[in-house]
Amino acid sequence: MPELAELRLTADYINECSQGKGPMIHYIKIEKNPAHKGTHCITPESPKDYFSLSAESRGKELILYIKEGDKTTPLRMSMGMSGHFKLTNTGQESKHAHLKFYRKDGTTLSFVDVRRFGKWKAGETWSTNRGPDPTTEADEFKYNVLKNLDKRVFDQPIHLVLMNQKYFNGIGNYLRAEILYRLPEVNPFMEAREVIDNCPMLLELCTTIPRKAYSLGGGQLKDWENPWQSDKEKFERFIKCYNNKNMGHIMDKNGRRFWFDPKWNIKMLEHISKQK
């Protein structure tokens, strides 16, 4: 699943395709795959004239701005497990293209989503149930966590709370593993409140680790195609813990595999016994 770094790279890709270094690209039509009929995929009406497209990310969300003349319509998107954008010649779009933006120059920018967990909604801005972006709103992010430490959600182990998008918007499976691995003194099965109270570096890493992932070009994650030709080897060297056969791992209560330093195996067993 694409995480904070991959969402920002997706926004960069859309902006590069739509603006680049030359004249503004003109779009002429928006088309939704008729397979999407639910309320989770509300598509704007196709503008009657040429329109431009730009994008911005915040945590795990993306907003496309569809601008026709003086009118701008936001289109909020989540990528799901496999969603990404791809520019092709018109008529050569993937069979898994579920939202298409046709361009005057004979090309199409498509939202491709093999597993179809992605969703979008026209006219919507950022979700109110997601917290600030840890990288672009670092101060707001820290404040949001610290002011809510008395909430019951922080009774849970830190490895679970890091996946809570209300407080850690953009942190996903590989980022939580890398953040916690870089805190060797932190038991990942300890109560989140205690960890945050005693280890302020945790919140710092929630900012610096995603920034580093972004600067390295993001990952080529399972079921997700990176729109950029990033240096795969550099990113793989950056990933120390996630999906590493030498690390410990456990399925968390949300069904996601959590990777951790194996020195915490005993604490992991204690955690499992408490759940029974």
Give, region by region, the residue ranges found by the protein language model.
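Acidic, proline/glycine-enriched N-terminal capping motif
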Residues: 1-130, 196-197, 258, 267-269, ...
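A short, charged helix-loop
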Residues: 115-155
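Basic, nucleic-acid-binding surfaces and adjacent catalytic neighborhoods in DNA/RNA-processing proteins
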Residues: 16-46, 56, 63, 68-72, ...
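Short, mixed-charge, low-aromatic patches
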Residues: 99-103, 130-138, 157-164
